Amino acid sequence: MAHDGQDMTQMTTSAILPELLTLTRAALPAVETVFERARDAVREMVTEDGRVSGALIEANQTAAHGLAWLATYNQSLQQMQRWADALAADGKFGEMEQLLHQIAFGEYLHQVAGGIPMNQGEVVRLQDMGLGWDALSGFQSTEVQTLMAQANSQAARTRLVALMEDQAGATMFGASGLDEELEMIRDQFRRYAQEKVEPNAHDWHLKDELIPIEIIEELAEMGVFGLTIPEEFGGFGLSKASMCVVSEELSRGYIGVGSLGTRSEIAAELIIAGGTDEQKANWLPKLASAEILPTAVFTEPNTGSDLGSLRTRAVKNADGDYEITGNKTWITHAARTHVMTLLARTNPDTTDHRGLSMFLAEKTPGTDENPFPTPGMTGGEIEVLGYRGMKEYELGFDGFKVKGENLLGGEEGKGFKQLMETFESARIQTAARAIGVAQCALDIAMQYAQDRKQFGKSLINFPRVSGKLAMMAVEIMIARQLTYFSAWEKDHGQRCDLEAGMAKLLGARVAWAAADNGLQIHGGNGFALEYKISRVLCDARILNIFEGAAEIQAQVIARRLLG
């Protein structure tokens, strides 16, 4: 609908640029050139004696991390173009999709030229990466100049939000580009989240309660825990793209519910990639059916992201079993799970990743009265701002026993490598969770902006409010396409650690921005605990921290780019 006396016909015809796909396609080489020049400049900064130096990357962290963000923008725009071209070929590139695509290019081209926000307090500019204005020579083309001047206009944003209002309650704003089977899966889990999760999520959060076991049982019946486990082991053998869709829609309902399958995904990936035949036959069917629930036990109090320096010890006894001694922290869903994927040091003569081994450590599920009944194991809850529903714990091990047969792969010293093999899937899934949280923020904020009236009209009729909603929708679609691309690569057997890292990096920032802007739209009410957006803000904050903090993620991406 038109707002504030605007004429609908005029707004529709003026908002979308002529020959849009031709314009955006022509802009891609200019961005690619800037990225290539930045990579060359940063590589020169961090090279010593003909080799890229880790110490110099650390010393030039702003430049290196800026390169990671620039590469992420470059890949994001490429995937938006791929998405748009595919929709156009199928006759599905409608007005909403055109506006999403157009605004995305207009905004991201400006940010590449003027500064990319790594977060709300850090903007990285081309000068930080050793480039001058001459690096932007390709940005002087008519196509790029047209997009920068006109693509992200107030008229475009206003028209986009008008279309969003017309489609209020739709599964998403804009076509996903996925096939019909995946959209059927999406619809199934969207309905479930609307019926069983959304009405209860805020109470679970405010009361800091565990997600009811009935929800876990229902999700198990729907196949959530065996989604990507091969059929021969009792799973559904579906794609990582299906995992994205399920994670996205459940996290849209509540991030805690969307994260229930994360540890099962990690455990299954570990066992499929590194387990013995006996371990696969024993554990995978139980994981797929949720007969057992796993938890990931990696992080230690003084190591954080530096997993290679873990100190928890695993000592092999004469009977071939192991005893675990040490401390772990930030262990999600630790109390009521049945098995821990536990990383510990089996070689005391090492101080890096080479002495680490992975165990499938069995435990007895706890109760509220006795959360950790297994001998040799203690734990205490860590109270947290958000990401509730499974609870976080510190764990202590003192002579905790693990059967020798539960050493993953039956070989010591392989634990870190085995864990690394799960990072692609874990980061893709986390990116999907971030999209779900961002979409939740948009859903809540848009409804509030429509319902809340100030100065005689709905908030959504004010350009700065509608502009926030428009940019939420645009960036959600950008993050979505980057995430789906990384899932596609994974499904087709291609290395995708770079793209998965980019998807997680961008998705986390998009989720936080959506939650923050969603709360801003609520004004003072957003600061009240009774309003759902307050929960979403707390939940969104974790996405830039876990599964690789944003700084670590950018560091990893930079190392891959620089070689």
Describe each PLM feature range.
Residues 2-253, 257, 262, 274-275, ...:
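Alpha-helical interface subdomain recognition
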Residues 262-268:
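Short, conserved phosphate-binding/catalytic loop or strand-edge motifs used
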Residues 290-298:
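A short, Trp-centered hydrophobic/proline-enriched beta-strand micro-motif
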Residues 302-311, 370-376:
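Active-site-adjacent elements of ketosynthase-type condensing enzymes
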Residues 302-305, 330-333, 348-350, 383-391:
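Short Gly/Pro-enriched turn/cap motifs at secondary-structure boundaries
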Residues 321-376:
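A short core secondary-structure module
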Residues 367-399:
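Flexible, small-/acidic-enriched active-site or ligand-binding loops
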Residues 395-417:
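Long, acidic (Asp/Glu-rich), low-complexity accessory segments flanking structured domains
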